[in-house]
Amino acid sequence: MGLEERLPGGILLSTVETVAGYVRKGSLWPATFGLACCAIEMMSTAGPRFDIARFGMERFSATPRQADLMIVAGRVSQKMAPVLRQIYDQMVEPKWVLAMGVCASSGGMFNNYAVVQGVDHVVPVDIYLPGCPPRPEMLLHAILKLHDKIQQMPLGVNREEAIREAEQAALAVPPTIELKGLLR
């Protein structure tokens, strides 16, 4: 004799966090930050063949104040890093970052002083998407993985604490230019 048997039909048992996550995952507004060839693949996901609109992303936002997902597609130079951080800070909460491509994830083949070796040294990244450039199907798969992550995210004070810890961990990692071994 469980609780489900005592309740009348049509009653849903859930938490506020689960319902909020379910609603939030279907209404992402991405801000495009296309810096290289990955941006071409990102643009093709909005076309009729891949149709990113079926996942609630009807339009790509040109302003950070109306976006909650930043897709960083391509390499980030040292001069571009403060601009990227400023755009991230202007985005509304809750916000997520997807590093698209090897250049955004780890600097790619550009291992020099002018390129940031991974966008996670500038902003906290939620999803890493490998490839050079990754196919649109891979971007859609990464967005679906982000949907799963969003649905399980905590709310309120718990979320702020999780974000603070992730940001501190990301900024504490040394850049690959300072690492020794096979990377150099």
Curated annotation (Swiss-Prot):
Pfam families: Oxidored_q6. GO terms for molecular function: 4 iron, 4 sulfur cluster binding; iron ion binding; NADH dehydrogenase (ubiquinone) activity; NADH:ubiquinone reductase (non-electrogenic) activity; quinone binding. GO terms for cellular component: plasma membrane; respiratory chain complex I. [4Fe-4S] cluster binds at C37, C38, C103, C132. HAMAP family: NDH1_NuoB. NDH-1 is composed of 14 different subunits. Subunits NuoB, C, D, E, F, and G constitute the peripheral sector of the complex. This is NADH-quinone oxidoreductase subunit B. It comes from Mycolicibacterium smegmatis (strain ATCC 700084 / mc(2)155) (Mycobacterium smegmatis). The gene is nuoB.
